[in-house]
Amino acid sequence: MGDEDVSRWRLGAALPEVLGGPEASLMLDHTRKGLMVEGEYIPLDVIFPILHGPFGEDGTVQGLFEVAGLPYVGSGVLASALSMDKVSFKQHMAGAGIDVGKFIGLTGDQWRSDRAHWQERIAALGWPVFVKPSRAGSSQGISKVHGPDVLVAAVEE
């Protein structure tokens, strides 16, 4: 990599070329494992689902592969789905006896119905706290909150 500017590692200008590529369909034929690309069968030994974000990391694509009977590497449907949902993941790990950091999971409706209650519970964790959407990938929507004065804005973002 060296001096290479990683900001150029984006689809950007190549998007029209990629979108204009051949259409591919998964075959739902359990006697053959492969893709149909422009009417031509292409056999597959295994799929490497190198994806990011919704439908890539949340178990959706893995479920599609399983329905189609296509072998793939990496996490399965449940592990992928749990990994995308932070609250469910922490509850699952805690239920298995694995220590997890203190957290509070709440929905938008819960927050709106009794904001003062949730502000007190969150403050009881101690500052700073991190506010993050439960089902957003990577660092999307994350805020480091140092006190109650900025908590509301972080939660409602």
Task: State each model region's role.
Residues 1, 60, 64-65, 146-157:
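Amphipathic repeat-derived elements
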Residues 1-78, 82-95, 105-120:
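ATP-binding N-terminal substructure of ATP-dependent carboxylate-amine bond-forming enzymes
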Residues 70, 98, 127:
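Short glycine/serine/threonine/alanine-rich loop segments
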Residues 100-105, 128-156:
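Glycine-rich phosphate-binding loop of ATP-grasp-fold ATP-dependent ligases
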Residues 118-131:
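Acidic/histidine-enriched active-site and ligand-binding environments that engage anionic O-linkages
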